[in-house]
């Protein structure tokens, strides 16, 4: 997909926002995975994390490298990286080209599938066969990955801190849909404060 075509994408306005705003706007949307054999799998986005320039936990905090280049791509470019030598994580570049800004898709809820399949970035990437080969690709109707709009009410949105970090640990830049069984890790204290329930 060309940059001009990307600018015409219906998702460009959503992903042109700062990561902290796009991360919320993506909740409830469907991540679409298309395979070469014609199969299509859709997962509802139920948990996200934001990473922005100036955030010490952001992969692009210091500089652009060959590994994190796609994070600096125009909004809608796919950034896939590997952790622990075996798990992959999918992110969507946001805000503007040449800026380190992206949303990590942390959990997906797949219809008619056990919740564990999408409960965490490594699990969802394994289920969708997402790896480094898709790094640098674009969201779009003819691409292996795309988005579809949310088609029913989101329910209760919880905001809390991100997971598995040693820097930027206090930033409340993780959001999830409380009613989804696919959320990778719940914050019961945040749920109590934001939903008015006891822990």
Curated annotation (Swiss-Prot):
InterPro entries xref list: Formyl_transferase-like_C_sf (IPR011034), MPG (IPR003180), MPG_sf (IPR036995)
SUPFAM superfamilies found in the cross-reference section: FMT C-terminal domain-like
Domain of life where this protein originates: Bacteria
Single GO MF annotation: DNA binding
GO biological process assignments: base-excision repair
Coiled-coil residue windows: none
Keywords noted in UniProt: DNA damage, DNA repair, Hydrolase
Pfam families from the UniProt entry: Pur_DNA_glyco
EC number: 3.2.2.-
Keyword Acetylation attached: no
Family per similarity comment: Belongs to the DNA glycosylase MPG family.
Protein name: Putative 3-methyladenine DNA glycosylase
């Amino acid at each position: 997909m060309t940059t001009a075509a990307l600018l015409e994408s219906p998702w460009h306005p959503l992903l042109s926002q700062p990561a902290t705003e796009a991360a919320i706007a993506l909740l409830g949307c469907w991540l679409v995975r298309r395979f070469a054999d014609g199969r299509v799998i859709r997962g509802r986005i139920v948990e996200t994390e934001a990473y922005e320039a100036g955030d010490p936990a952001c992969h692009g905090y210091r500089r652009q490298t060959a590994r994190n280049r796609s994070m600096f791509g125009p909004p809608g470019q796919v950034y896939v990286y590997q952790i622990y030598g075996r798990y992959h994580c999918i992110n969507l570049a946001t805000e503007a080209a040449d800026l380190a800004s992206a949303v990590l898709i942390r959990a997906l809820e797949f219809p008619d599938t056990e919740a564990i399949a999408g409960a965490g970035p490594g699990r969802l990437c394994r289920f969708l066969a997402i790896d480094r080969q898709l790094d640098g690709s674009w969201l779009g109707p003819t691409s292996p990955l795309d988005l579809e709009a949310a088609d029913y009410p989101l329910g209760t949105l919880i905001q809390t801190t991100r997971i598995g970090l040693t820097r930027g640990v206090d930033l409340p830049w993780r959001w999830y849909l409380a009613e989804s069984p696919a959320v990778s890790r719940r914050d019961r204290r945040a749920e109590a404060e934001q939903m008015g329930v006891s822990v």
